[in-house]
Amino acid sequence: MTSFLLYLYTESPLHAGAADAEGSLNLPIQRESTTGYPVVWGQSLKGALRAAGYDAGWGQGSLDRVFGKAVQRDGEPGVNPTAGLLTVGDAQLVALPVPTLRRTFAWATSSVALSRLSRKYTRTGLPGEIPDVPDIAHDRGVALDTEWTASDQVVGPCLVPMSRPTTAGGLENWAERIATDGIGDGSALAYFADKFRTDMLLVGTSIMDQLLRECTEYAVRVQLNPDTKTVEHGPFTSEYLPTETLLATVLTLRTPQGKDTEHDAEHQRLLRKLFDGSVLQIGGDETLGKGLVWSRLAGEGTGE
């Protein structure tokens, strides 16, 4: 069994739709019911990854073995006749881009988000020491660059008292590891990786809760009658995770029955080629250019 840590970095706003409307918001994004954190559920992500494999020219046999056979139209709804070898976890939030008065925007993260990422590194068994997760008061923020700590900072709708980390290494090591593993230093993303190393802000739970609700994007649209060009349906409001959002998930590839090492090696090769440094499409509004994400494999291990 092989586990991969997969980062997803949004190139365009991402709408992984939830089931129910919320007040005036007709099409909200998926969120955890307990924390309110945005998420892309594993069942949604798995379908998108399977479609990416199909678009990349995978043979039907490889698609069926890795992702399971497609549900037949006349079959029982929601029942997959073959589970497939790949387990796809939920893509959980690592860092959310938020508007600031200084440097245009920064990434907000929290002890919850970093602790979950720490668990993912532990589960996958990747080499290297996992940094400690700094502790922080619920109504304060911590930053690495002194430009952020010179005064209180406007972060989204919040005025946040900022300070330097009280312990050495933890936050700085997280910023470096996420920038390297999750964004990468390739020419297309090097600027954002460097910015992340200085502009990742660790904020308390009270602040993060407000940012998660008020720093997503909303789009109001209408549907026109094709003949009269007048409004036929709407307006309706859609919610999106903004561009530059960072998510992470764990993929677990089980070994085929009978210790089929040849197929196992081929499956691993296909996954590495498909997901490492590629642009995938996830979620709705594909024809509007939404849901494009840079995928990056942080590495692989034999965890779980």
Predicted regions and their residues:
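Basic, Gly/Ser/Thr-rich N-terminal segments that form RNA-phosphate-binding interfaces in CRISPR RAMP
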Residues: 1-304
